């Protein structure tokens, strides 16, 4: 799949789930389940409830995503 096929959206982490999964509320109000990208896992980026994140979704399943960036601050 080409990189252009992904949908990038901003959201807020509202819940932490087991196995580095998170429940994220997107800007449009939808709630998705997201996991951490491999690069964030490798660099030990910590994600807590309330953090602002960027989530990458595929057009095939809009209920699951990948957290690709945690905003500073």
Swiss-Prot record:
One of its GO terms (molecular function) is translation initiation factor activity. InterPro entries: NA-bd_OB-fold, RNA-binding_domain_S1_IF1, S1_domain, TIF_IF1. It is found in: Cytoplasm. SMART domains: S1. PROSITE patterns: S1_IF1_TYPE. The keyword Cytoplasm applies. The keyword tRNA processing does not apply. It holds the Pfam family eIF-1a. Signal peptide: none annotated. Gene3D superfamilies: Nucleic acid-binding proteins. It comes from the Bacteria. One of its GO terms (cellular component) is cytosol. Keywords: Cytoplasm, Initiation factor, Protein biosynthesis, RNA-binding, rRNA-binding. Disulfide bonds: none annotated. Residues 1-72 form the S1-like domain. Belongs to the IF-1 family. Component of the 30S ribosomal translation pre-initiation complex which assembles on the 30S ribosome in the order IF-2 and IF-3, IF-1 and N-formylmethionyl-tRNA(fMet); mRNA recruitment can occur at any time during PIC assembly. One of the essential components for the initiation of protein synthesis. Stabilizes the binding of IF-2 and IF-3 on the 30S subunit to which N-formylmethionyl-tRNA(fMet) subsequently binds. Helps modulate mRNA selection, yielding the 30S pre-initiation complex (PIC). Upon addition of the 50S ribosomal subunit IF-1, IF-2 and IF-3 are released leaving the mature 70S translation initiation complex. This is Translation initiation factor IF-1.
